[in-house]
Amino acid sequence: MAMYDDEFDTKASDLTFSPWVEVENWKDVTTRLRAIKFALQADRDKIPGVLSDLKTNCPYSAFKRFPDKSLYSVLSKEAVIAVAQIQSASGFKRRADEKNAVSGLVSVTPTQISQSASSSAATPVGLATVKPPRESDSAFQEDTFSYAKFDDASTAFHKALAYLEGLSLRPTYRRKFEKDMNVKWGGSGSAPSGAPAGGSSGSAPPTSGSSGSGAAPTPPPNP
């Protein structure tokens, strides 16, 4: 099985636990976040779906070669925190939105009033008087607190997004990654230790006419 060599067990192995992003995927997600109108609940509801499209898995392992023809970058701890802040801010909902009513006001359904009664100065039966909320009302205080939270959530969202958009990624690709990490990809193709380079064992056979002993040949006897 093909795999990286022993040098992988140092720095390259440690980085497999870090979040990685593919550069084009990163640009797409941040562009879509920039189009979000945070003041609109419908747009805030889109944020979790946008963030779910951000892929942060490590693109390589000891048995999986770094991708070719793609640029990847490691995300810093600060970038991960900024993404988490955007996710958290997206969960904000105004209390008035949750109640589907304006805090402190009474929903009124007036009864049918005859044309003659409408000219009377008295308050018609069935028509409730709408009073503005008082500062001492608990509902008013809840709504004030809710809007303060909205300001905090909006600020957190825009600051985190500005940080991510200004982030200087350090993209890398296969050749650069393997050079920087000093790793090589392949199987165990090297010859065993002690084996000759030519792949043969023993000494070379003697040439023709040679005894192989290194001594001069014995002359023929005299007749």
Curated annotation (Swiss-Prot):
Subcellular location per the Swiss-Prot or TrEMBL entry: Virion
Region (Disordered): 117-136, 181-223
Ranges annotated as biased composition (Low complexity): 202-216
SUPFAM superfamilies membership: TMV-like viral coat proteins
Keyword field: Capsid protein, Virion
Statement: the UniProt record of this protein carries the keyword tRNA-binding: no
GO terms for MF: structural molecule activity
GO terms under cellular component: viral capsid
Protein name: Coat protein
Protein species of origin: Tobacco rattle virus (strain CAM)
